[in-house]
Amino acid sequence: MTMKSLMLTTAKAVGVTLLTSLAAHAAYFKWEMIELPASTGATCGNGTPYRFFVNRTPLNSKAVVMFEGGGACWDQSACKGGSLLNAVNPDGIPENYMSDWNRQAHLGLVTPFTARIHPLQAVQTQSWNIVYLTYCTGDVHTGNKVNVYNNTDPANPMTYFHRGAINAQAVANWMAKNMPQPDHLLLTGFSAGGVGSTANYAAFRTTLKPKKMALAADSGPLFNVPRTATPEQAPSVLLHNKIREVWGLDGPEGLVTQLISKYPGAGDVNNMGSITAGLGKIFPNDRIGYTMFQEDTNFSAFSYQKFYPEIANAATDADRLKMLNVKWRQEIAPWIAQMTPTNVGYYIPNKRDINGSHCTTIVTFGGTSIVEQKLNHVGEFIDNLLDGKGPVMRAYETKPTTQRVLLSDMFADWLAPLIP
């Protein structure tokens, strides 16, 4: 047998093997529903089974895990859902979640990270294994507590399972057993998922043991808020201290308690925001990144509106937004100041019209430029985190342009009114 014929025979054998593998695993390149058994402790807030979705590829072992966003809750009304800041998916996750356009995932198109081919944006993880970690627990993927809420309907109390942290760990365990060890892993999430990806980073890191790993947490900042701070010092303190209790964050089995117990260098149990920099300290070879807008109107409302009557009862919506942004901007500076590890970075443009300047990575990366630093969009930050070359990017827009100069920004502005 000649070398040429040997190579041809070998190539054919490899091709047949690959095709056989693809045929044997019909779920490649499409969404596969995974329902976690009750024995894992995983559940949605209403007690229904927890389901998440996987879109696999046989071509590499790299993986991106997307933590879904949505509102949150700590009372009966909000846990029933129905409005922007309330719990999303209050009735659980149906089996057809990723094929139902009316669901928040929008067939995976909600972010460029969760679509093989996205009509508006390319990102290198589109060729990776994709895991969509759904959100149905009203606790920004961090809780481990069961509560009974009856404040709006005492005759019909609601038992609600804040099991976000349990769900996340169960997903990581499933991945470790059913998927290859990742050569490269990106943990990301938007809004509530931005918090979730940050808070559960260590769990995925230690469970999956990827060769390389990065975090891109979008618009779910854990601000630098000591437990004993006053509202004047740290406006988010009322929110932080509320969710500590209702979601069991620093209870004996709480996520914060367990994280700091395992990794004392990760931060301080009395300041949940300390993990922002803490991840860079305990995982010095990883690249840790945070992104959001300076004029975010949604997460700021979640953080302050229920706790400050002057905001909730503002005379006009413009007044409400102005008061929200004053508090929001007050907390950005100390949040950034604590990011001292050199492997921690951020990308913080001023605003865009899409979704009330909430989330830089949903729909499209357009509208996220920082022109003064010659950065076209947040995708350059994502590439910086993933490529692992040079210092981790730190970009903060200080000179917002009064008129768009990039076509991608103009397109995002045109698109904004079309997005519900």
Give the ranges of each region predicted by the language model.
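Bacterial N-terminal signal peptides
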Residues: 12-21
